[in-house]
UniProtKB/Swiss-Prot annotation:
This is Armadillo repeat-containing protein 8. The keyword Protein transport does not apply. It comes from the Eukaryota. Gene3D superfamilies: Leucine-rich Repeat Variant (1.25.10.10). Disulfide bonds: none annotated. The gene is armc8. It comes from Xenopus laevis. The lineage of its organism: Eukaryota, Metazoa, Chordata, Craniata, Vertebrata. Pfam families: Arm (PF00514).
Length: 720
């Protein structure tokens, strides 16, 4: 059985391992069952808190033997239980240890152990399963491979408090998406764990609460069920709301707030409900304060960002709660550079006393998993002034620097999503634009993405585009981001660029000069529909009221082939933006005539293709507007008048039942019949021949005043 550590140990190390640890493994093979039991107990005592010993025993083959003893019918229940305990201890070591246990098929063996009638053995198996499943190297799908496992775990919930804690923890960690939510929901997880929220055990209450938070996330079905579940006469949202009280543990407040947030976003609680406005939102703002642990501040900010993201009223309330906008500035005060870390460590090594973390809490209160993982984080100011942290704890704090920046950017993005006044407050925060610009070049991809999202949110402000964005030349780092970034960053960055290319943005000119046309044209070739949309959208904004050179550059950059590929795109958003681009390209007479002289045949083919296709009203309206622009050209209108197929389509749509299409077709007719232009008489006669005038007479009696006026204006051209 392939049950070894990676990479393999050197021979010199292996001989040392053999000398010091072989006797523990040898005793597992003793013919006397009592000696085997004592050997397992001694092994248990040897590995607790000793990762080196754990690794040694795994290398020497202890795991297959322990699993064999655990599964043997002839093994006593006590021996099986002790084997499960040792395996659990081994799984609390390094990730390589867990990988080795998985290679030895530990999970099926432990799941089989759950069929036992002995409670202590069941609890030992569950404890080990909990540790294995919560390791980042364990595929959570292993919980769902055997369809009988979930219902059996549901039955075990009634066996003991420990069983409840471990099972809820397994569920919470292994529920990673809608498929898992559905499986757990269909097996009655909501009804089976709801009563655990009132358990006498704090750990059980917390694990049940965490389970509900992952079940409710982005799941309307589960959330609606939760909203109507009663426990001891109280609805679950009321129980969650009580857990938000300030006297409850921070972990409980935060997790309960997540439950209510997810239920609100899933639609089972209204955004104006008091439990959201007066309890959940203020609680999450409290979690962002600098008195909280770094992990709490990160989760609090990200959860609050998610809660308020779609609702402008919640954004306004959050922005004036506890000085949140200025509070978030502290999120950027944590060092993330090597030099800053070195400076702090050098300060720490100047002889000032540091407290051992194990001395900071009473003995006997932590299990092994707690002893081997630091769980306390302090503000940097405390590191610098009090020097209460060990180097290991300091590293633990510093790794959160990126997470803090990411969370702050996310929350700023949500706060500024809709309200101009809030955006102004955010941008006026000290060094805010500098922080965003710096965030665009962070080494962490997640921080860069969050910074771009924040920039995108703020770029919706006309005022800020004209002032702060120009003052800080935001377009420069944004263009750099667009040169080489993962798709998720490219999507948001290109959306931001669309806003910077609006006609009133001072950034438009320098962006054009920096070679943006080529970049945006390349985005339209992407397999990602969102990137194609944004690329063509930015080009559309670029072409609005642009000079002939820019329009020519766009057409040259896209190529005729690519332009018509976009016009036949399966994504309607891509099609709409491409039509918008064409409409902007064909916007003044000289430009219309110039473009139609070189691309007229292909454009007319595309227009015909779209008007004949199964497209929605908006697509056809936009296409008719392009025809109206072509009809406004001096020479370009001849391409319509010599195309009987197009003329019949204009006739069809001016008599259509949809008002938008009628009006768009009417613009075509008005431009073709305008009698002040050369050749108007011939065009009027041809339109009369195909029956357009008869339709105009009917439309002049329309109940819609706009359509009626347009029809009368067109008729007047015939009698002027």
């Amino acid at each position: 059985m392939a049950c070894v550590l990676e990479p393999p140990l050197r021979m010199s190390v292996l001989s040392e391992v053999t000398a010091s640890s072989r006797h523990y493994v040898d005793r597992l093979f003793d013919p006397d069952p009592q000696k085997v039991l004592q050997g397992v107990i001694d092994m248990k005592n040897a590995v607790i808190g000793n990762n080196k010993q754990k690794a040694n025993l795994i290398v020497l083959g202890a795991v297959p033997r322990l699993l064999y003893l655990l599964q043997q019918e002839t093994s006593s229940t006590e021996l099986k239980t002790e084997c499960a305990v040792v395996l659990g201890s081994l799984s609390m070591g390094t990730e390589n240890n867990v990988k080795s246990l998985l290679d030895c098929n530990i999970i099926p063996a432990l799941l089989q152990g759950l069929l036992s009638s002995d409670l202590q053995f069941i609890e030992a198996c569950l404890r080990c399963l909990r540790t294995v499943f919560t390791s980042p190297v364990t595929p959570v799908e292993l919980l769902y491979t055997d369809a009988s496992v979930i219902p059996h775990l549901m039955l075990l919930l009634s066996r003991s408090i420990y069983a409840q804690e471990y099972i809820c923890q397994i569920y919470a960690h292994c529920c990673k998406g809608p498929d898992h939510q559905t499986i757990l929901f269909n097996h009655g997880v909501v009804q089976n764990i709801a009563h655990l929220l009132t358990s006498v055990s704090y750990k059980v209450r917390m694990q049940a609460l965490k389970c509900f938070s992952v079940l409710a996330f982005d799941n309307p079905q589960v959330s609606m069920t939760l909203a109507n579940v009663l426990v001891d006469g109280e609805l679950l949202p009321q129980i969650f709301a009580k857990m938000l009280q300030r006297d409850k543990p921070i972990e409980m407040q935060l997790t309960a707030a997540k439950c209510l947030t997810y239920m609100c976003r899933a639609g089972s609680i209204r955004t104006d409900d008091n439990c959201i406005v007066l309890k959940t939102l203020p609680c999450l703002v409290r979690m962002c304060s600098k008195e909280r642990l770094l992990e709490v501040r990160v989760e609090g900010a990200e959860t609050l960002a998610y809660l308020i993201e779609p609702d402008v009223e919640l954004q306004r309330i959050a922005s004036i709660t506890d000085h949140l906008i200025s509070m978030l500035a502290d999120y950027f005060k944590y060092p993330s550079s090597v030099s800053a870390i070195t400076d702090i460590k050098r300060h720490q090594e100047t002889g000032q006393p540091c407290i051992d973390p194990e001395e900071a809490e009473p003995r006997g209160t932590r299990d092994e998993s707690q002893c081997t993982a630091l769980s306390i984080s302090h503000p940097v100011s405390q590191i610098q002034h009090d020097c209460l942290l060990t180097s290991e704890e300091l590293d633990h704090d510093l790794k959160h620097a990126h997470e803090l920046r990411q969370a702050a950017f996310k929350l700023y993005a949500s706060l500024g999503a809709n309200d101009e006044d809030i955006r102004k407050k955010i941008i006026e925060a000290e060094h805010m634009m500098d922080r965003i610009v710096n965030g665009l070049s962070e080494t962490s991809v997640k921080v860069r993405l969050a910074a771009v999202r924040c920039l995108h949110s703020l770029s919706r402000s006309v005022q800020q585009l004209r002032t702060s964005f120009q003052d800080h030349a935001v377009w420069k780092p944004l263009m750099k981001v667009l040169q080489n970034a993962p798709d998720d960053i490219l999507v948001v960055a290109s959306s931001t660029l669309c806003n910077l290319l609006l006609e009133f943005s001072p950034s438009k000119e320098p962006i054009l000069e920096s070679g943006a046309v080529e970049l945006l044209c390349s985005l339209t070739l992407s397999e990602n529909p969102a990137l194609r949309v944004n690329g063509i959208w930015a080009l559309m904004n670029m072409a609005f009221q642009a000079d002939q050179k820019i329009k020519s550059d766009i057409l040259r950059g896209l190529s005729t082939e690519q332009l018509f590929q976009l016009l036949s795109d399966s994504d309607v958003n891509v099609l709409m933006k491409t039509l918008g681009l064409l409409r902007n390209l064909l916007s003044t007479r000289p430009h219309i005539d110039q473009i139609m002289s070189t691309h007229g045949k292909q454009i007319m083919q595309a227009v015909t293709f779209i008007l004949e296709g199964e497209h929605n009203i908006e697509v056809k309206e936009q296409t008719l507007c392009i025809l109206a622009n072509i009809a406004d050209g001096t020479t370009a209108k001849d391409l319509i008048m010599t195309n009987d197929d197009i003329l019949q389509k204009i006739k069809y749509y001016v008599g259509h039942s949809n008002l938008k299409l009628q009006l768009a077709a009417m613009f075509c007719i008005a431009n073709l019949t305008w009698n002040e232009e050369e050749g108007s008489q011939e065009r009027q006669d041809k339109l009369r021949e195909i029956g357009i005038v008869d339709i105009l007479h009917k439309l002049s009696q329309s109940t819609d005043p706009n359509l009626c006026d347009k029809a009368k204006t067109a008729l007047q051209q015939y009698f002027a």
